[in-house]
Swiss-Prot record:
Recorded superkingdom: Bacteria
Single GO MF annotation: glutamate-tRNA ligase activity
EC number(s) per entry: 6.1.1.17
Residue span of motif 'KMSKS' region: 251-255
Name the UniProt record assigns to this protein: Glutamate--tRNA ligase
The keyword Mitochondrion is annotated on this UniProt entry: no
A GO term from the CC aspect: cytosol
Compartments where found: Cytoplasm
Chief location bin: cytoplasm
Enzyme class: ligase
Length: 493
């Protein structure tokens, strides 16, 4: 009997997302319910954005939740390497195989040519897509341009008409017209694969039998199916999971909800409760109970109990469930978890240097630095009153800083300062005009330890959460303001 093998393949390009944890949980439960194996693979072909720090955060977040893997970059296994950046020769070999078989072709089009092609198609009211012009090149010209070292990509051929039937374990057969598919790039001009080629090659070579992924990938499923057909490989069973939603039914995004697993750990949520809540996202136990452990979910896991309606990720409901778990802890374990969460030596050593020189007794630490141990702050709107800025300017400054911080890849004091400086300069203000607002939003006080040091210590998730909290207190941002300020943001270096 074939061993069930599932996987999660996140990209290490930012904070570990709750959506990644959600898909990982369901892949894990499906594999373990069938006595199978769960694999972690790192999709790090985006060399500009991928970092080992983000990769380690993925490891830490999944392990904090209690999700372990049988094979992966850090534990090894018989199907490695498990980082796509280390599998370049493998992808190149299979891409060449597709070209030789006539299923793919070399494309030498420049970015300017592709942009012109797109503009002309849109002007004609057509859906922008590659027009296949490289297919008209003779073999001799292709070889000449390759020999000359001309930059190129490899694209796959796709049918121009007909229907592709996608067998989905949740929806049954889904029909998608081929004329919606573009001639997908498989190998980029830097020699690295795109998601589509790497995904198919890796899943096949790693023996993946079932793929549970987000439903946002369903429209592009025909490309993957066609690649399996081109290679002559058996396709894994496919399951397209419903996407997590904000309370307003929009797709879960960090602009409306904290999306990082690290944020919920820092806020003091229990990993058991977090997993429990993610397990209830579109799935339910046979007896409909709300509170259950990972082991209980594995024992009763059945894909037929997944609902296709977009599950709502609601922090208030998560908090309620966390309270159920927390209150059932033995007092000794409760105390131990509190100490591990807030008063562990690593965290205290980050805070101590900034507090020690400002107090005369230990009892003064809490009033000065208590915000380091809080999640949501009790804010006073009076703290945001400015002699220099109008109420609208206050909100504008804070919103633009929040947006700039959302784009920050490396969370360091110098870079945080740079974001704030860029905003105030664009608005022709001084740094001293913005810093009182930062003190108020981040510490809940008019003054404290260096707010820039505090932001670095608190981390990106909690910092951005508190800025959003402050903006909500001040009335939020209207749709008109949002549109106008985003245009302004685009011009801020």
């Amino acid at each position: 009997m074939t061993t069930v093998r599932t996987r999660i393949a996140p990209s290490p390009t930012g904070d570990p997302h709750v959506g990644t944890a959600y898909i990982a949980l369901f892949n894990y439960c499906f594999a373990k319910q069938h006595g199978g194996e769960f694999i972690l693979r790192i999709e790090d072909t985006d060399q500009l954005r991928s970092t080992r720090e983000s990769e380690q955060q993925i490891f830490d977040a999944l392990r904090w939740l209690g999700i372990e893997w049988n094979e992966g970059p850090d534990v090894g296994g018989p199907h490695g390497p498990y980082r796509q950046s280390e599998r370049g020769e493998i992808y190149a070999r299979y891409a060449k195989q597709l070209v030789d078989a006539g299923h793919a072709f070399y494309c030498f089009c420049t970015a300017e040519e592709l942009e012109q092609m797109r503009a002309e198609q849109m002007a004609r009211g057509e859906t922008p897509r590659y027009d296949g012009r490289a297919l008209l090149l003779s073999d001799e010209e292709v070889q000449r341009r390759l020999a000359a070292g001309e930059p190129h990509v490899i694209r796959m051929k796709v049918p121009s008409e007909g229907i592709c039937v996608v067998p989905d374990m949740l929806r049954g057969d889904v029909e998608i017209p081929w004329d919606r598919m573009d001639m997908q790039v498989l190998m980029k001009n830097d020699g690295l694969p795109t998601y589509f080629l790497a995904n198919v090659v890796d899943d096949h070579l790693m023996g993946i039998t079932h793929v549970l992924r987000g439903e946002e990938w369903l429209p592009s499923a025909p490309k993957l199916i066609k690649l399996y057909e081109y290679f002559g490989w058996e396709q894994p069973k496919l399951c397209y999971m419903p996407l997590l939603r904000n309370p307003d039914k929009s797709k879960l995004s960090k602009r409306k909800n904290p999306t990082s697993v690290t944020f919920y750990e820092r806020m003091g949520f229990m990993p058991e409760a977090m997993l429990n809540y993610l397990g209830r996202m579109g799935w339910s136990m046979p007896d409909e109970r709300e509170k259950f452990s990972l082991a209980e979910m594995v024992e009763h896991f059945d894909l037929s109990r997944i609902s296709l309606g977009g599950p709502i990720f609601d922090i208030e409901k998560l908090s309620w469930l966390n309270g159920q778990w927390l209150r059932e802890l033995p007092v000794e374990e409760f105390a131990a978890r509190v100490q591990k969460w807030a008063f562990n030596s690593d965290y205290m050593m980050k805070i101590a240097p900034h507090v020690q020189g400002r107090v005369e007794t230990f009892s003064q630490i809490a009033p000065l630095g208590g915000f380091f141990f809080e999640g949501a702050l009790k804010l006073d709107a009076k703290l945001f009153e400015s002699k220099k800025l109008s109420a609208d300017q206050v909100r504008q400054v804070m919103q633009l800083i929040l947006w700039k911080l959302e784009s920050l890849r490396q969370w360091e004091k110098e870079r945080i300062t740079g974001c704030i400086q860029a905003v105030v300069e664009a608005l022709e203000l001084k740094l001293r005009d913005a810093m009182p607002l930062m003190f108020a939003a981040i510490t809940g006080q008019a003054s404290s330890v260096s707010v820039l040091d505090a932001m670095e210590i608190l981390g990106p998730d909690l910092t951005r959460y508190r800025l959003r909290q402050a903006l909500d207190l001040l009335g939020g941002v209207s749709k008109k303001e949002n549109k106008e300020w985003e245009k302004l943001l685009a011009n801020i270096a």
